[in-house]
Amino acid sequence: MIGRLRGIIIEKQPPLVLIEVGGVGYEVHMPMTCFYELPEAGQEAIVFTHFVVREDAQLLYGFNNKQERTLFKELIKTNGVGPKLALAILSGMSAQQFVNAVEREEVGALVKLPGIGKKTAERLIVEMKDRFKGLHGDLFTPAADLVLTSPASPATDDAEQEAVAALVALGYKPQEASRMVSKIARPDASSETLIREALRAAL
């Protein structure tokens, strides 16, 4: 239904971003690896989206390019993997990092992601490897994977709280999220920086 949005960023509350298109505000869930690349509030952004309809909600998931969206759609076809878990997977790893982990059968790397146990990791490897064979070889080499070090927004007083809330939204338990953030917290860090560093440290 809604495959692409081009509009002005109104608010960024990781992992959610509010984009205004033609006077309508769309709330979009984005993996943190994509969220890092968004421009600041007030600037224009283009987001490729996947629309999910549930009994209790209609949700938009957003990505910086079609390759990331394709990988997300393949992930949610896997038994036991829903949109929330797929979002967490692509927040902990970039698209290319995930593809590499699957191709190398790195179960140990996958089980470090929230919500991924050994059985789910093994199932992902088996099912996703088969799917990759039917896709173009360069499908999952998006440019976004090369720009994870882009500048984050200025630090705010509640950056740590925002970072903890984002990690909880991605599937980490509150106590675990707090511990992850406290390990890498520093006064001058923005919430996006804290989230990025906490996820990297977890892997």
Curated annotation (Swiss-Prot):
Keywords: Cytoplasm, DNA damage, DNA recombination, DNA repair, DNA-binding, SOS response
Effect of residue 164 to I: Defective RFR, UV light resistant, resistant to MMC, may interact poorly with RuvB
Chief place where the protein resides: cytoplasm
Disruption phenotype: Sensitive to radiation, filamentous growth after transient inhibition of DNA synthesis, little effect on conjugal recombination in wild-type strains. Increased sensitivity to mitomycin and UV light. Suppresses lethality in recB-recC and dnaB temperature-sensitive mutants.
InterPro entries reported for this sequence: DNA_helicase_Holl-junc_RuvA_I, Hlx-hairpin-Hlx_DNA-bd_motif, NA-bd_OB-fold, RuvA, RuvA_2-like, RuvA_C, RuvA_C_sf
Annotated cofactor note: Branch migration by the RuvA-RuvB complex requires Mg(2+).
Pfam families: HHH_5, RuvA_C, RuvA_N
Gene Ontology terms, MF aspect: ATP binding; four-way junction DNA binding; four-way junction helicase activity; identical protein binding
Keyword Phosphoprotein applies: no
Induction of the gene: Part of the ruvA-ruvB operon. Expression of the ruv region is induced by damage to DNA and is regulated by LexA as part of the SOS response. RuvA and RuvB are also involved in mutagenesis induced by UV and X irradiation and by some chemicals. Induced by hydroxyurea.
Annotated GO biological process: recombinational repair; response to radiation; SOS response
Segments of this protein annotated with the region Flexible linker: 143-155
Span of the annotated motif Acidic pin: 55-56
Function: The RuvA-RuvB-RuvC complex processes Holliday junction (HJ) DNA during genetic recombination and DNA repair. The RuvA-RuvB complex plays an important role in the rescue of blocked DNA replication forks via replication fork reversal (RFR); RFR and homologous recombination required for UV light survival can be separated. The RuvA-RuvB complex promotes Holliday junction (HJ) branch migration. RuvA binds to HJ cruciform DNA, conferring on it an open structure. In the presence of RuvB, ATP and Mg(2+) the junction is dissociated; hydrolyzable (d)NTPs can replace ATP but other analogs cannot.
Oligomer status and interactors: Homotetramer. Forms a stable RuvA-RuvB-Holliday junction (HJ) complex in the presence of non-hydrolyzable (d)NTPs; in the presence of hydrolyzable (d)NTPs branch migration occurs. In electron microscopic images the complex is formed by 2 oppositely facing RuvB hexamers sandwiching possibly 2 RuvA tetramers at cruciform DNA structures. In E.coli X-ray structures only 1 RuvA tetramer binds to HJ (complex I); however in M.leprae and T.thermophilus, 2 RuvA tetramers bind the HJ (complex II).
Matching NCBIfam families: ruvA
Domain-level remarks: Has three domains with a flexible linker between the domains II and III, and assumes an 'L' shape. Domain III has weak interactions with the adjacent subunit. In complex with Holliday junction (HJ) DNA, an approximately square planar DNA molecule is bound to the tetramer's concave face, with the DNA accessible to solution on one side. Domain III moves 4-5 Angstroms toward the protein-DNA interface upon DNA binding. The isolated N-terminus (domains I and II) forms tetramers and binds HJ DNA but does not bind RuvB.
The protein's name: Holliday junction branch migration complex subunit RuvA
Species this chain originates from: Escherichia coli (strain K12)
